[in-house]
């Protein structure tokens, strides 16, 4: 009978985190049992509690923070390559969709909205959404200012966009009816439709959008 290779402490911890990401992503926080995580990881329950004394809540928070940092890093890297605020918005949306496509379980973790979550986790998820919404508001505000428009409504647009994007991504991951680039185009076009109705500057935003997405194709599809 072959001997089982002994895992290092770091390897066991990583295995637990990967297993927890999968199980939480599939079943949600409340329906997940510690026994399912250790079974998926191939370790014992005492081993999980040795690494995470707080049990399910602690490992959930650890997984959440790991993926949050990864997502924010990828968003930041993508948006840093932009030459203008509107392009930064496009790159940010695309990076968010790419992250969800490559890490579906992590996306479902970050989009968790269960009313049965522990208060500490609810607070952390609120912080996550606030961080993302604040970044969106800053970028949208820059887009509006560049078009000589008031940025007062930027936080409103940001929260609408964030909620809409989360819903769209959940649908897209399940159906994959469109290419990622097409989803990004339609989301940006939806913003353009709204900005176009503003009293001043809408035409300038439309011009900038036409340089980074295929507006004629979208307009044709919507006619």
Can you annotate each of these PLM segments?
Residues 1-11, 199-223:
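N-terminal intrinsically disordered/low-complexity leader segments
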Residues 12-20, 37, 59, 63-71, ...:
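Generic hydrophobic, amphipathic alpha-helix propensity
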Residues 13-14, 34, 57, 61, ...:
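Short, structured helix-loop boundary elements
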Residues 15, 23-58, 62:
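Helix-turn-helix
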Residues 26-30, 82, 103, 147:
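Short coil/turn segments at alpha/beta junctions that flank glycine-rich nucleotide-binding fingerprints
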Residues 62, 76-105, 161, 184:
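Hydrophobic alpha-helical connector segments
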Residues 72, 119-145, 155-163, 182-185, ...:
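Amphipathic alpha-helical packing segments from all-alpha helical-bundle domains
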Residues 87-88, 101-123, 137-141, 167-174, ...:
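Amphipathic alpha-helical segments used for helix-helix packing
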């Amino acid at each position: 009978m072959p001997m089982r290779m002994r895992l290092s402490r770091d390897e066991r911890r990583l295995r637990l985190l990967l297993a927890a990401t999968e199980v939480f992503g599939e079943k949600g926080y409340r329906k997940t049992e510690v026994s399912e995580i250790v079974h998926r990881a191939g370790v014992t329950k005492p081993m999980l509690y040795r690494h995470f004394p707080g049990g399910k809540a602690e490992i959930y928070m650890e997984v959440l923070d790991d993926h949050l940092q990864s997502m924010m890093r990828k968003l930041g890297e993508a948006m840093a390559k932009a030459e203008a605020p509107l392009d930064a918005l496009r790159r940010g949306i695309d990076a968010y969709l790419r992250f969800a496509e490559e890490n579906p379980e992590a996306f479902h973790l970050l989009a968790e909205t269960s009313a049965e979550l522990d208060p500490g986790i609810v607070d952390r998820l609120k912080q996550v959404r606030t961080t993302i919404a604040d970044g969106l508001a800053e970028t949208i505000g820059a887009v509006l200012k560049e078009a000589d428009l008031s940025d007062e409504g930027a936080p409103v647009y940001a929260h609408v966009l964030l909620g809409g994007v989360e819903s769209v991504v959940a649908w897209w991951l399940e159906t994959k009816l469109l290419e990622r680039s097409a989803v990004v185009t339609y989301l940006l076009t939806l913003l353009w439709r709204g900005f176009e109705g503003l009293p001043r500057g809408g035409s300038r935003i439309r011009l900038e959008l036409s340089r980074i997405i295929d507006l004629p194709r979208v307009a044709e599809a919507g006619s």
